Structure formats: C-alpha cells, structure tokens
Amino acid sequence: MTDQPIPETEVLPATHPKRSWVARFFRFSRNLLLLFILLSIIWVVSDRFLPVFVTPLMVIRSVESISHGEFPKNSKKWVSIDEISPNMVQAVVASEDNLFLHHHGFSFNDMSKAFEHNLQGKRIRGGSTISQQTAKNVFLFPDRSYLRKGLEAYFTVLIELIWSKQRIMEVYLNVIETGDGIYGVEAAAEEHFGITASQLSRSQAALIAACLPNPRRFDAGHPSGYIQRRKNSIVSLMGKVEQVNFNKIIPPATRKHKHRHRTS
C-alpha cells in the first residue's frame, strides 16, 4: 500500500465577531439616515403644495384635552396668503423676524442677542426666525433638547431651499397657535373679532401678533394692559420695517418656481 497524500484543508480567515457587529451597526445606521433624509425631503416637497391641516402640536393639545376629560377644541381654517391681510404679514415680520425677507433661515444676530439676554438671567428669550418657527411647528414636537434643535435647523434649511418665502409665510400664518385650541390667523380673526383674516386692520393684526409668544395665556379679543402696550409697540414697528412684498424677492437658484399669489 502506498500512502495517500493528505489533502490540504483551506484555512479560513479568522472572523472577529465584534468587528462584524460594528460594521453591521454602521451599515444599519447609514441606511436609516439615508431613509430619513429621503422621507423628510418627500415630506417637505409635498407640504410645498398641499395645505398643512395637522401639526404635532395640535395632536399634543388634543391628547392633553382628552386626558383632562375635555373634548378637544381644534379651531382652524386654511386660507391662501392672498386671503390674509398684508397687515397680518407686516405685524409678524415686525414682531417676530424683521429680516425675514433677507436671511436664509437663520438670524445669527438675533440668536446672539437672545443668548446674551438669557445669560444675564432675564426672562428666557428665543432668537428663532419665522422659518425656524415654521419648521418646528410643522415637522417637530415641542421640546428643548439638542436633538430637537438640530432637527429644527435641518428642516429650516430644507424649507428655505424647497419653499418660497411666500410659502413659508403662508404655512406659518395657517399653523401657528393663536389661542387655546385656535390655530392660524383665519380662525383667530373669526374667534376674536368676528371677521376674516383678509379684513384685519393694523391694530387687530398687531394684537394677534402680540399674543403669539404665549397665545394660551393672552387673549387678543380681550387684551390686558401688557398686550395693549405690546400691540402699540408692534404697530409702531410696522411703520419702520421694510414693507413686505414677495414679488420683489430675488429667489436663489434653487427656487426656480415662484408662487403666483397676490400680495396686495
């Protein structure tokens, strides 16, 4: 008998379970991030054309009412920007974001002032632009975490790239909380003054704007002395800030399609 050669066995490379697990985790995280980016872009693009009827804040307020044994009040009515008085647009620009037409979503000057103000131990003040507030109201739950602020910045960039300034203002004025269970300036005008948003005077628009920092505490229909003083200040500012005219905005290259709404 002759000895048969022993076949060589293939030596497989040693596997490292820990490295394999880490690689799978990073692949999963990458795919999850890409999915989030894709879905968020689709969401923002769809909201560029469709009315926004429900926001996370509306859901939270409804759940709070139900938990207290109350029937949730949800007064809102979507209207286009040309059905809203220019006085209302001017009032929120004067009171909330006087550089709205010129910035690209962020006002670093206002953010710096708010930071210095808060460091002095005074009443906490935000430095959010109308674009940031719109991103927060439409896409996010109210929260003060760094994650939420990061997502707010992300969605702010998206709407500034995909929406026009006119659309940002239109959505903002339709979804902001303007009272207890009241959302948007059309519902606020009807609730507080018995008129439509297109009929708002400078004084009425300024009253609504004056209550925006805390609309569940203050009532534009029955203003306190503080709200009256704040209203007078806003009316004065309305005459000083640049007149809002969306037709005069030169859109960036990414904004190729302009909304065809009246602004007068």
Predicted regions and their residues:
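Juxtamembrane regions of bacterial inner-membrane/periplasmic proteins
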Residues: 2-264
